[in-house]
């Protein structure tokens, strides 16, 4: 299979209110349905230790959250399993609608947008960047029970991605990602998104996303505690800190999970 190739996607450069961008974001909801993204995320969440423990309240951060509707679907599906969640929806654009926030509230989730570039977030000592909308004060260093990234990590080359993952490892108990799979079947599927009514922006970006996607253990290799994988080399102390899992999911997706093996309190 081809080497990983990251190219800027068209949607990233369109204004929030550009008609093509508005249409493309609607397309993404159909793409998620076609890929079964919500069910993939639900399975990943239900496989975590924190889900089995049903501990709460929980603090959750979604990176590259977009309009927040995918995560809302996850919250609705989880139902009473997680009745009390503090959620931050991080994106560099302010796309979350009041109706979406109301939907989270109906699930018992307190959701707020966090408008900041993720690399700014990753480069600061705290978990947020003031004066970004919805951000905590610059002196705060909150930890997250769970950080989620969905169709987001593939936007980054290895160096910035490693920086992002290092920030996630420092600030979370668990990190989940669902990304495009870099494989022949996924590439064929990306050329067919027009069949579900996708516009030109979405059709072009779908192909680019597969070329920038992942396979094998590529995300694990960039995780700062990658020695946590079974039989991996490295410092035994670091190996004891995390359990990693990386695998294909469905026809088109690639999943990664990193979870602290000792869940004693908040992450540092």
Residue map of PLM features:
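N-terminal auxiliary segments of SAM/dcSAM-dependent transferases
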Residues: 1-14
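Class I SAM-dependent methyltransferase Rossmann-like catalytic core
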Residues: 13-51
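Class I SAM-dependent methyltransferase SAM/SAH-binding core
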Residues: 61, 67-121
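A short SAM/SAH-binding and catalytic strip from SAM-dependent methyltransferases
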Residues: 145-159
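A short, conserved alpha-helix within the catalytic core of class I
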Residues: 156-168
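Conserved beta-strand signature within the Rossmann-like core of class I S-adenosyl-L-methionine
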Residues: 172-180
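C-terminal alpha-helical "lid/dimerization" subdomain adjacent to the S-adenosyl-L-methionine
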Residues: 180-227, 243-247
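Conserved Class I S-adenosyl-L-methionine
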Residues: 216-268
């Amino acid at each position: 299979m081809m080497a990983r190739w990251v190219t800027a996607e068209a949607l990233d450069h369109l204004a929030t209110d550009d008609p093509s961008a508005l249409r493309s974001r609607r397309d993404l909801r159909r793409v998620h349905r076609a890929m079964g993204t919500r069910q993939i995320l639900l399975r990943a969440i239900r496989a975590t230790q924190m889900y089995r423990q049903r501990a709460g309240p929980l603090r959750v951060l979604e990176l590259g959250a977009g309009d927040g509707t995918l995560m809302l679907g996850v919250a609705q599906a989880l139902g009473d399993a997680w009745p009390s969640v503090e959620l931050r929806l991080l994106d560099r654009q302010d796309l979350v609608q009041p109706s979406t926030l109301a939907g989270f509230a109906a699930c018992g989730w307190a959701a707020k947008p966090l408008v900041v570039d993720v690399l700014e977030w990753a480069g600061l000592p705290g978990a947020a960047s003031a004066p970004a909308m919805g951000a905590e004060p610059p002196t705060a260093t909150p930890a997250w029970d769970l950080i989620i990234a969905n169709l987001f990590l593939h936007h980054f080359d290895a160096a910035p991605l490693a920086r992002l993952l290092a920030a996630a490892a420092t600030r979370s108990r668990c990190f989940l990602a669902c990304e495009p799979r870099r494989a022949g079947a996924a590439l064929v599927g990306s050329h067919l998104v027009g069949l579900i009514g996708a516009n030109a922006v979405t059709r072009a970006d779908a192909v680019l996303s597969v070329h920038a996607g992942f396979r094998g253990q590529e995300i694990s290799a960039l995780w700062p505690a990658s020695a946590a994988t079974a039989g991996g080399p490295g410092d035994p102390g670091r190996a004891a800190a995390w359990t990693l899992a990386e695998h294909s999911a469905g026809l088109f997706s690639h999943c990664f999970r990193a979870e602290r093996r000792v869940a004693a309190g908040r992450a540092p």
